[in-house]
Each structure stands twice: as structure tokens, then as C-alpha cells.
């Protein structure tokens, strides 16, 4: 049976996807990057040249090693106990791989008693998400005139990306 396309259920809005890191700040495991504005994963594969006289005029290649990088941007916060620039800098200077996850957060309903600020931003492990380990290769802080200060993180993967697709 052919797939029935449904844009209301098939697509994920960008602000629903977040980066989480294991920082030790909380007891729940993964901590969301505070005030994140974007996150991305890029997966690359090296190519091995297998061209020979039998290839005629065309190059021939095979897949080689795979690698990935993760990057994210966030607004700068001076809040403590959250995954902020200071947390990212400390993790980078620790020279150790960091466990990470990218996925959707548990849906949070804003009601009369609950405000948006009460949202714990918890990784929804009942929906597809990705995990792995990476070394933080750079963190940066940017503060332009008449702008909210922001920070960025770049990580280089160590080992495989693990797709988690709960049934």
C-alpha cells in the first residue's frame, strides 16, 4: 500500500527539535541547551577512489569512513544550573566526549496554572531521536550592539550516530 502523505502529521516544526547534552546539571540525564535558537547535524562520508583502466572515462568510488558534526546556537544566559555558555565552556575544557541527543521535547500544555516558563523541556523518548558522543570542538560568545548576546557550540562526533525509533 502506498504511503498517504499528511503534512499535519509527517512534518516536524523546527522549534520542536532541540539539542540535549549530558552535563550532570540534572538528575534526568539529558539537559536541553538553554534558550536555543537552532541546532543541526551534518553527516559526511569519505569516498575512496576505485578508478582503474576498467572504469573507462568515469571515476569510480566506494564509501569510506563516515563522520558527523553538530552545531547549535543559543541566546546567552547567566542563569545557573542550566546548559549555558559557561556549562559548554567547562565541558569543552574537560577534554572529554559528551553524550548528546537531538529530538523532540515532550509536549507541554500551557494552562491557567502552567506558564511557558514552567516547561521542563524534556526529551521525548517516545518519538524518534538520535544519540551519540562528541567532542566539543568550539564554543563562541557573540555580543553585538543593541542585540541579545548569543553563543554557539560545534561538536565533532566520536563513534556512530544511533537512531532511536520507538515503535
What residues fall within each predicted segment?
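Solvent-exposed edge beta-strands and adjacent loop segments
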Residues: 2-78, 129-152
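Solvent-exposed, non-transmembrane amphipathic alpha-helical segments
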Residues: 56, 92, 156-159
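Acidic glycine-/aspartate-rich tracts in secreted/extracellular proteins
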Residues: 75-80, 160-162
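Short solvent-exposed strand/turn elements
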Residues: 149-164
